[in-house]
Each structure stands twice: as C-alpha cells, then as structure tokens.
A protein has these predicted regions:
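Bacterial N-terminal signal peptides that target proteins for export
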Residues: 3-15
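Gram-negative bacterial Sec-dependent N-terminal signal peptides
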Residues: 14-22
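C-terminal motif of bacterial Sec signal peptides marking the signal peptidase cleavage site
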Residues: 25-28
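Bacterial signal peptide processing site
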Residues: 30-32
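Short, compositionally stereotyped local motifs that mark structural "simplifiers"
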Residues: 39, 62-72, 76, 80-232, ...
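Juxtamembrane proline-rich low-complexity "stalk" or linker regions positioned immediately after a signal peptide
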Residues: 41-68
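Middle-to-C-terminal accessory/interaction subdomains
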Residues: 187, 196-204, 214, 238, ...
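Conserved ATP-binding subdomain of kinase catalytic cores across diverse folds
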Residues: 207-397
Length: 649
C-alpha cells in the first residue's frame, strides 16, 4: 500500500514536538482495557517449515515440510486424517484447503514459480493484494510466476471454493520476498491485510480498530517460524502520526473474528528473545517460548521520521539499548527485549520496525507463572487536547499537569487498584517534609505496598540514561492481586515499576531543541526532574507539574538513610567503568545489526518527513551521538549525584 508523501512544515514540526513529548497515550488502543490483553489458551504452531528452492544458511535447499501439528496441542477441533500440506499455520482446521508447491519466505533466484492444487471438485481462487479471496477473485489455472525487484515480493492468499462458489476451509497465505537471509541480524515479518482495512486504521489513527490479518515471521537465518492469522492494530501514542506506523499483532483464538475465514492459534510459539527466561513458576529458568502478542514499533521519538525536533539525531537504537542495559543493572525492573525486524506489508517493503515484547498482564503471567486475572497494570497516558483554561497557548498546559493522567482496565477492581496506587503516591509526596514520626509511619506503609528495591533501580536507571520524558509521563506499574504463592516473590502484592518508552534518552535531543525541557545531553542533571517541585534550589526553569505524584515519591524515599545509601551505591555502579563498557557493547551490537539494513529503510521513507536523515552517512553520525553520551555521562552523572546527596548531609 503506497502512502501519500507529506512534507511537514516547520510550524507543524513544532506542534508535533509537543505531541512527541510522550508516545504513551492519546488512545484507548494501548490501555489496560485493550482486548488484546486477554488470556488466550496455550497452543502450539507448526515446527519451522521449509520447502522449494528457498535459500538456507548452508546453501542447501530446505527439506520437505513436516506434518501438521497434533490437534491435541492446539486450540482447534480435530480433523480426521488431515493431509500433509503447506497450509500456513499447520493446523488441520478444515478438510479442504489449497496446497502450495513452495513455502513463503526469502528467495534469491531471478524468478520463482508457485503451483497451487486443491482436492477434486474444488476451485482455487487467489489474491495478491492482501485481501481474502472471494468468488470474484482470480481463478487459479496456471502456475504463478513471481518476479520481484530485490527487497520486494508478492503475497498470495488462496482458498478453495465449492461448486456453489462458497469459500470452504482455511485461507492459506504465502509471501515470497526477493532477498537473502542475513544470519543473526534481524527477523523478517510479512503481514497480509486487506487494503481497505489498512485504510480504515490509517484514516483515524487514534480510533480503537482491530482488523484480521495474517503474519509470517522468518528467523534471522531465513527459516519460517510463524505463519498464522492474527489481530492487527496500530500501536503507540503520538507516534501514530508518523507515516510509518507501529503495529500490535495479537495471537487471537478461533472464533474471535466471527464468521470471517480466519484461524486463531491463541499463541505465538517461538523463543523470539533468547535472552528472555521465565523468572518463576514451573518453567523457571527456561527460555520463554509463548507470546500472546508482539509489538512492531517504529521507534517513537527515536524513529527516523520523528523530525519535529532535532531531525538529525534519531537512530532507532535507543529504546532497545536502554532496556537491555536495565536488564543487567536494574534486574528487578521489568523491561522489554527487542530485535530489529524488516517488515513487508502485502509484499511491499515497509522498512525496519522493532519486534518487541508486549508488557501487559499476559507478559507477567508468562514470566512468573501466575494467573493474569490476578495482575493489574496501571499506565500513565497523555492527551494533548486536555486544557486547563488558564493558558492562552494550550501547549503550556503540559506544565500544569492537564495532559497527563493514569489509566487501567475499565473493570471496577482495576479502577480501585489504580485509585489505591495514586493515593499511595500522593500520600508519599505529601510527607516529603513531614515530621520524623509521621514520616516513619508513612514510610512503613509505603514499604509494605511498594517493592523498594524495584523503585530504587527504576529511578536510578531513568536518571542515569537521561529520560526527560519522565517522571511526569511514561509510567508503568503493576501488582499481583491474588493469593501468595510459595517461591514466587512477586505474589507479595507489592507495586512494581516496568520500563516504558526509553527512546527519549541518551543524547536524543540537544540544548537547542524547540522545547528546552526535553534536552537529553550527557550534562543534564536529571535529579532536577524528580526534585524541583519539592526541594528548594532544584530546577531553574519552568518544570512539569507532579500530576502523577511520582516526582514526590523520589524525595520521599530519598529521605530514608538506607534507601539513600543503596541508591547512591547503584548510581555509582551505573557510572562505573564496567557498566560503561557494557553500555558501549550494547550500542556497538545494535549499530552493527542496524547499519546493513538502514540504507533501505532510509530510502523507503526519505521524503515523508521534513528534515529526515537522508543517507547512511548521516545516520552513522546520529548514532555516534549515543557513543558520545556513553563516554561523557559517567563523570557528569557523578557530579550531579554528589550535589544531590550533599543536601542530605
């Protein structure tokens, strides 16, 4: 699907700068009442398929496809004696479906020929535009010859029709891309969706719209690991305004899309992130292999199309690097792993997106072996249309707190949990300067309801990495609400922080940005972000209102001697040579993975945003600013830390 090119004027860019202060909200699509945050039953997908003359890492041709998955292992009715076939997700859902001679994936030949067969008495009809075949679609008669320019391809969706023209059984989807596998570098994600459905999502990017689609995912070595029908939604907050969208793909169960001919497996089964191991429960220590949904993110404020401020600095690297740094040095904070994915939409190259974990209730369920019905997630949201009425310029309302608020699931129990969280933070903020007796009383209450070590690590990491889109925004907390379980620490019922949108970090914005408060250079004193509204002498410019009460929680906790000592120790660890070397390693790894594919990404989107990075050399220069930050940050951070600690001496 071709997107209209729209060059953004400078005035519009400044407006977008206000919008991009946070990519967290603006829509119910990414809130706790998201229907994607359901509890699909566990299911399995077919073992990785291979076939035809697709290229494997060793240069050989793939083996014959494996038989469909045992129905007992899926969320589907049994079909007697389902034949071996290349039916996409491998599920013997229906007795009648077309068989492809070649499995979708990457190919290097100049052309590929695909034959499709059907059981006797049935006609095959197919489409190449991503839509579901109908009785008016092209009838298959001869082999389909696929010729595509390098990096492009063709999506074929086929189905069987009976003598009355009725679609029977599963729609089978295979996408063929003219490209070679680059082992270890990135996933390949091929999405197929009706063009009208895509237009409906793009027409109102903030509407709560989900459409049926098909997802094929290839491992970095080119092996086809996923092929199944999914729910497709736009994802993110203000970054939805960018030409390249972020998507959420959801492993829906059978019947979710009503009478439409889609098959739901309920789970994506593959270890997408080998670093991710289950933390507790019966699968503790094992690599996580089941996901209910996945995110394909455009990078938010670090997207190359995010040009409203400092358009020569985005890289698509920051969020992933920051989260992995937190995984090692703030291990009690729930974070999101990510890998680069080259994405195709209906066979057309769509550029690079980050394939990420979706940090919802299902994420907690998978990590800790608990019931997701006993997990509540509360997130801050951003709505730039909310105004206080006291400012002539609505953009100034960001400072009075009108824009920022908490959201969670609409159910009464979740709403009560959210109110309890707000009340706890508000009580702490109100006790920053309380008498010692009153402070100790309230600290004991906070300590009984909040994982103190988790909060300490979360705040230290955000300050070190210079996340200036926080703590007034981009907050995610969660709590287990069920009965305690032996051996599972998080069932103590305490609130815990998780990362959210770490793209606003590590030298993304310079001092000369249109909005001075978003500066993220290595010299920034981020302690002012959590102290300026509560401690005299911090913050010499207009500062965000503490509408979410997290700014007050920090000085409240810092008043405790033990917390302050542990916080200082972790901060010095973050600024240590060892941590600095690790952060440098993370940067170099991400750079090495992105650079070989960044040129095509830039070519795909160049011209869609005013001032966007136009070539690989410019991107390399932007990426080097992260390296500059990593080198300069430790000394600056320790200086600010010592200044802050001196207040408590």
């Amino acid at each position: 699907m071709k997107h209209p090119r729209k060059l953004t004027t400078r005035a519009a860019a400044l407006l977008l700068a206000l919008l991009l202060l946070g990519t967290a909200g603006l829509t119910a699509c990414d809130k706790g009442n998201d229907p994607s945050d359901t509890d699909p039953a566990d299911a399995t997908t077919q073992a990785p398929e291979s076939g035809g003359d697709l290229t494997l890492p060793d240069g050989t041709t793939p083996a014959d496809p494996e038989a469909p998955t045992d129905p007992a292992e899926t969320d589907k009715p049994s079909t007697p004696e389902a034949p071996d076939s290349l039916i996409g997700d491998g599920s013997p859902l229906a007795e009648v479906y077309p068989t492809f001679s070649e499995v979708g994936g990457l190919y290097t030949a100049r052309a590929k020929t695909v034959e499709i067969t059907a059981p006797e008495g049935y006609t095959v009809r197919y489409t190449t535009d991503g839509s579901v075949p109908t009785k008016r679609s092209t009838e298959y008669k001869d082999a389909i010859k696929i010729t595509a320019d390098k990096g492009e391809g063709m999506t074929i969706r086929a189905a069987c029709f009976d003598a009355d023209g009725k679609l029977t059984g599963q729609v089978i989807t295979h996408t063929y891309i003219s490209a070679k596998a680059e082992a270890g570098l990135h996933y390949t994600v091929m999405l197929s969706c009706d063009e009208d459905d895509l237009k409906a999502m793009y027409r109102d990017v903030h509407a709560k719209v989900e459409r049926a689609a098909h997802a094929e995912i290839l491992a970095p070595d080119g092996t086809r690991i996923i092929s199944q029908d999914v729910g497709l939604r736009l994802f993110g907050g203000s970054s939805r305004a960018l030409s390249q969208k972020s998507f959420k793909i959801i492993a829906r169960k059978d019947g979710y899309f009503g009478d439409e001919p889609y098959v739901g497996l309920g789970t994506f089964t593959y270890p997408f992130f080998p670093e991710r191991t289950v933390i507790a429960g019966k699968n503790a220590g094992k690599v996580l292999e089941k996901y209910d949904g996945l995110i394909l993110r455009n990078g938010g404020n670090d997207a190359l199309l995010s040009t409203a401020a400092d358009p020569d600095r985005p890289t698509l690297l920051r969020d992933g690097i920051a989260n992995e740094f937190i995984a090692k040095y703030a291990p009690n904070v729930q974070m999101s792993y990510a890998h680069f994915a080259v994405v195709y939409l209906n066979g057309e190259y769509y550029g690079i997106l980050e394939l990420r974990e979706n940090q919802n209730e299902d994420y907690i369920k998978r990590l800790y072996g608990v019931d997701d019905n006993d997990v509540v997630v509360v997130k801050s949201e951003l709505d730039t249309t909310r105004a206080c009425g006291d400012h002539r310029n609505a953009g100034e309302c960001r400072f009075c707190g009108s824009w920022f608020f908490y959201e969670t699931d609409s159910e009464a129990a979740a709403q009560k949990e959210m109110k309890d969280w707000i009340a706890l933070c508000k009580k702490a903020a109100g006790a920053v300067n309380a008498s010692e007796a009153e402070y100790r009383k309230i600290f004991a209450e906070v300590e009984s309801k909040l994982d103190i070590r988790n909060a300490l690590e979360y705040m230290a990491a955000a300050c070190y990495l210079v996340n200036t889109d926080w703590p007034h925004n981009n907050i995610r907390v969660w709590r287990y609400t069920g009965a305690p379980m032996d051996g599972i620490a998080i069932t103590d019922g305490k609130w815990r922080f998780a990362t959210r949108d770490m793209d606003f970090t590590m030298n993304r914005y310079d001092k000369g940005a249109p909005l001075p408060e978003i500066e993220t250079t290595p010299t920034v004193d981020t302690f002012k972000w959590v102290l300026s509204n509560y401690v005299e002498g911090y913050g010499d410019h207009q500062q965000y209102n503490d509408a979410l009460y997290l700014q007050g929680l920090f000085p409240f906790l810092m008043r405790d001697d033990a917390f302050r000592a542990d916080f200082a120790e972790l901060c010095r660890t973050l600024a240590s040579e060892e941590a600095n070397a690790y952060l440098t390693e993370l940067y170099q790894t991400a750079y090495d993975q992105a650079y070989p594919i960044m040129g095509d990404h830039i070519d795909r989107w160049s011209g869609y945003a005013h001032g966007m990075i136009s070539d690989a050399r410019s991107w390399r220069k932007a990426a080097q600013r992260i390296e500059t930050f990593i080198k300069a940050r430790p000394a600056q951070f320790l200086k600010h830390l010592d200044k802050m600690l001196a207040m408590y001496e």
